[in-house]
């Protein structure tokens, strides 16, 4: 039996701010706000609006959608959401999934193959995803105790490295907001390039970070660690409604020699606490779908024992047959190189070759 759909309503910026103000205790991810949608627009992307979902007059959830027009797979993506204002039960989530299917199948302005969002209680038609989205685990640092207790809760290794960084002359500065884009482009992006090359990942280009700093400046901090006047490590944090996130960071080889990233993050915690934030999420640690995050997980575990599991991102197909056909095609494309290698190995061995010893 298909669950009864919720009533849904698109929210203007004023509507969203009114809803948020009426629910001060709910953690709303910055990615689920109109301010993040403005940032996406500045990048040339297509925010499709924020909707609220109601059970009668009771607000259940909200979701901000980003339209994607990738070849053969048009979709709507909810980044780090939806936001839940009531208990996230299996029944409530099933109703939201059914509502989203009905909502966008009937929307003449968009024809997505699927909607992608975080789902905690997975049941049909939820499936996939074709590729993974948001990280699934994070470490959270409680900023409500006094600074001495926060520091004492770190692992001994972290406390020692912070002290060593101070003795080695590492200096942490908060960059003036009007200089963020310039400083990032000329001094900090090269550190990101070095980090990406060293750790084997692809970073965004400098324009992405500069746009982030320009468009979301009211909700960001940029802090930099210097050694002998030279920047060696930097971080960007976000803040919204008292919850901060350690969002982007990079460090040079010189930073590692001086333990600068440890002192930098500690100084950031103190600044965030002073600004009224009650917690800081160190987003993105090792999980089943993100084993490559082992190294950063080791670093982040130094600052808190609290690990929070975030619901995994899944797909909600609106056109199941087309979705399954695409899923099969993508799987075959991923498997093709391995299949080709096995065929080549077999040809080299020849028809009389044996697979193992007698």
Task: Describe the predicted segments one by one.
Residues 2-16, 69, 120-149, 278-358:
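Active-site/acyl-donor-binding loops of N-acyltransferases
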Residues 84-90, 145-154:
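Short, polar/flexible loop-turn hinges at active-site or ligand-entry regions and domain interfaces
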Residues 111-118, 173-174, 224, 279-282:
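A structural signal for short, well-ordered beta-strand segments and their strand-loop junctions
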